Amino acid sequence: MPNWLAVLLALATAWRIGTASTMSAATAQQAAVPASSSTLDYEFFKMRVQPIFLTKRPGHARCISCHSSGTPLRLQPLPPGRTVWNEEESHKNYDAVLRVVVPGSLKSRLLVHPLAEEAGGDFYHSGGKHWSSQNDAEWQTLKTWVMGSQQ
């Protein structure tokens, strides 16, 4: 996807949820620069990060509920009766999530959108704030992956 098309998609999405006037240039630029698939560990993603998208949290829908259609982070839908993704679907999810990650950056959208503002998150994410602290175990797992660690 050309960089200008990714920026246009990010702006259109922000406008759709009523935040176009406040979308920062940094967020638009981040949308235009997808991470390289060679920089973040696929196996860590598949085994540790991807299950987070299926986890039910009190007061919130599972990430997959909204992120399987109509959002910039588009995960593969799970067929009825299945509770995990197959290898092909996991690779597609990995590629989709790379679009919201800048390897080594704590400002990656994957980290800041679902994090409470008072914990360092931003005001985006119409699905609510899933983590109130950067000390949350799930958020720490996401951070570990984004920072390039495999532990």
Segments from the language model and where they lie:
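Positively charged n-region of N-terminal signal peptides that target proteins for export
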Residues: 1-4
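Bacterial N-terminal signal peptides
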Residues: 6-16
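Aromatic- and Gly/Pro-enriched helix-to-coil junctions and flexible linker segments
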Residues: 15-151
